């Protein structure tokens, strides 16, 4: 003999409520765009362009001063002088090892 106990599932109730909301909402055809200025626009408003240009004139400029490591021509030196010195030292170490082996 089986006994059936009704199980109250809150997830089922939530899905039923969502179905009701979906069925009672307006379709996209019924929703009209409002003529407000902040509605979606593909092209910018010309008055916004003029306002932007006025603000653009007020923006501060960024000045970057050269540091000691910068080259005056603007070119980067690669490898840096520090690495070149280290490589020379490694080269002399390798030569010394070869001479010791012979």
Curated annotation (Swiss-Prot):
Protein name: Protein LBH
GO cellular component, one term: nucleus
Species this chain originates from: Xenopus laevis (African clawed frog)
Function: Transcriptional activator.
InterPro entries the UniProt entry points to: LBH, LBH_dom, LBH_dom_prot
Family according to the record: Belongs to the LBH family.
Origin superkingdom: Eukaryota
Domain LBH: 18-101
Cystine pairs: none
Record flagged with keyword Transport: no
Record bears the keyword Transit peptide: no
Chief place of localization: nucleus
GO biological process: positive regulation of DNA-templated transcription
Localization per record: Nucleus; Cytoplasm
Keywords: Cytoplasm, Nucleus, Transcription, Transcription regulation
Coiled coil: none
